[in-house]
Amino acid sequence: MASHRPRSNKAANGASTSPKRSWIIVSAALVGFCALIAALDSIRSSFYIFDHKAIYKIASTAVANHPGNATAIFDDVLDNLRADPKLAPYINKNHFSDESEWMFNNAGGAMGSMFIIHASVTEYLIFFGTPVGTEGHTGRHTADDYFNILTGNQYAFPAGALKAEHYPAGSVHHLRRGTVKQYMMPEDGCWALELAQGWIPPMLPFGLADVLSSTLDLPTFGITVWITAREMVGNLLIGKF
């Protein structure tokens, strides 16, 4: 008759401690990752090259100089940015009149087009808007977002508000990090100089998800990924995080 040896206590203890050891390793790695993220987040502003107050001054001055003229305003804004030697190396070298640099953006139910002036890990600066109007969800983001209105009007409201916030040309709409609103650009059009400061990569899925789940506009997806990567990687290579 075959006999069965009882499993040794040593083997049993080894088997029981193995999952515990794995959980300890995973937990330690998770704590370390969270600590790293918290440390980086505490110094994120040290990576910024833009001052949102200076951007507002550039935008509002351009609006005052060329009221209602989007082309002249865009030129004025870019001329001022490129005239600053601290900013010029990090600005898109192409002109906004180059149609290949523009792309549609479908996000949160809204649709507009954008021109990327700057993109890096902690900041982006774009022209964004539409001449025909749109409305949608702002998204809940890992960055502060400053919409400097150049032409037209933007309206927004947070859940619970009974009246809309109104942002005319020359004003700035600050969407604070982690907050969310519905926003609308009327049918007569609106263009904005949008500055985001915080962690940009986590925002990218919001800006790209509609292409994959709804519009299936793969050429636009490709252009968006290519130009964003070109600017981000290019800036990383010259020391802009």
From Swiss-Prot:
Transmembrane segments: 23-43
GO cellular component, one term: endoplasmic reticulum
Subcellular location: Endoplasmic reticulum membrane
EC number: 5.-.-.-
Membrane disposition: Single-pass membrane protein
Swiss-Prot/TrEMBL keywords: Endoplasmic reticulum, Isomerase, Lipid biosynthesis, Lipid metabolism, Membrane, Steroid biosynthesis, Steroid metabolism, Sterol biosynthesis, Sterol metabolism, Transmembrane, Transmembrane helix
Gene Ontology molecular function: isomerase activity
Record keyword Ribonucleoprotein present: no
UniProt pathway annotation: Steroid metabolism; ergosterol biosynthesis; ergosterol from zymosterol: step 2/5
Family, per entry: Belongs to the ERG2 family.
UniProt-recorded name of the protein: C-8 sterol isomerase
Broad EC category: isomerase
Pfam families assigned to the protein according to its UniProt record, in alphabetical order: ERG2_Sigma1R
Gene Ontology biological-process annotations: ergosterol biosynthetic process
Entries under InterPro entries matching the protein: ERG2_sigma1_rcpt-like (IPR006716)
Organism: Mycosarcoma maydis
Matches recorded under PANTHER family: SIGMA 1-TYPE OPIOID RECEPTOR-RELATED (PTHR10868), SIGMA NON-OPIOID INTRACELLULAR RECEPTOR 1 (PTHR10868:SF1)
